[in-house]
Amino acid sequence: MFGVRKLLVGVDLVANPENPDRFELPAPTREAVEMGLRVGEFSQAGVTFLSVIEPLPAGATEDEQAEVTASAQAALAGLLSEAAERGVQAETQVASGHGWMEIIREVLRNGHQMVIVGSRDASTASRLWLGSTAIKLLRLCPCPVWVARSNDEEKTQTIVVADDLTDVGQHCLHLGVSAARLLHARLLALHAVQYPLERHLRRIDSSPEELREYRETTCAEAEKQLNERLAMTDFRTISEGARTEITAGRPDVVIQDAIEEHEADLLVMGTVARGGIPGMLVGNTAERLLNSLSCSVIAVKPEGFVCPVQLD
């Protein structure tokens, strides 16, 4: 059930074009709010709706700042009513500063176990839709981050879970199963198989038959592990079903191809801290994917991830 008891939803507010003194929620933020309320219902989690407003220019008065804050709080008030109607315990907060920084600080202060934010804009080109706030959260936030992209299509959704057969990959499988149950989606557990000994085998003049046997054995072992790991989850409770897929190739290419082939709506993937550089993604797999993703994404940090953001 996600294992979430405290959930933080980042609420992006934009000025109402007909009344610039009032704020409203853009479509991607509405999607994030909806996902937050669903997770709150599903996991009986408390939800905090946090809106971060940009500091006013130098010279602005305290009254002007207070007026902007009050407008933001008024825009958030309706979310409390929505949450109450669905039996979700919720609260709202307004902060001033950089969105990604204040969201991470709130996670560090109050121990939120998941962050959900909206994308930049569903109509934006796919390589840009994540936006700078989402990118920084995916890289730096210590808890799982769900970047929700609005989807108007009425079809059964598909969730791809990229499992690298590590502990963080197992966490991704559990989250993917929970998301599939939540969204009534089908699940694809995916592993990009590698052949680490192939270069050595070629160097010692192994025969084509030996190389083929090595590849087949490696794939079979990976498939066995992936099925065993999926069996450790509640995948049988997914109404639309679950399956595994083993594909040879560079992980980011394999994942992107699977997303396109299956028209995936959500990718669940792990990130790994690069040695000595806190907050970076390793192996370029996740970094490459961030530039090409066309679906929503949940990014999971490994145990021991070092968040470079510190509380004052």
Regions found by a protein language model. Give the residues of each.
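Structural beta-alpha unit
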Residues: 1-3, 54, 63-74, 81-115, ...
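Glycine-rich, Arg-bearing micro-motifs that act as flexible, cationic patches
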Residues: 19-20, 117-136, 155-156, 266-292, ...
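Short beta-strand elements of ligand-binding domains
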Residues: 116-119, 144-150, 297-301
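General small-molecule cofactor/ligand-binding pocket signal
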Residues: 48-50, 91-95, 146, 188-190, ...
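A short acidic, glycine-rich active-site loop
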Residues: 65-74, 208-224
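Small/aliphatic-rich secondary-structure junction motif
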Residues: 2-62, 66, 158-212, 241, ...
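Short, structured interface segments
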Residues: 130-151
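Short, well-ordered secondary-structure micro-motifs
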Residues: 20, 60, 128, 172, ...
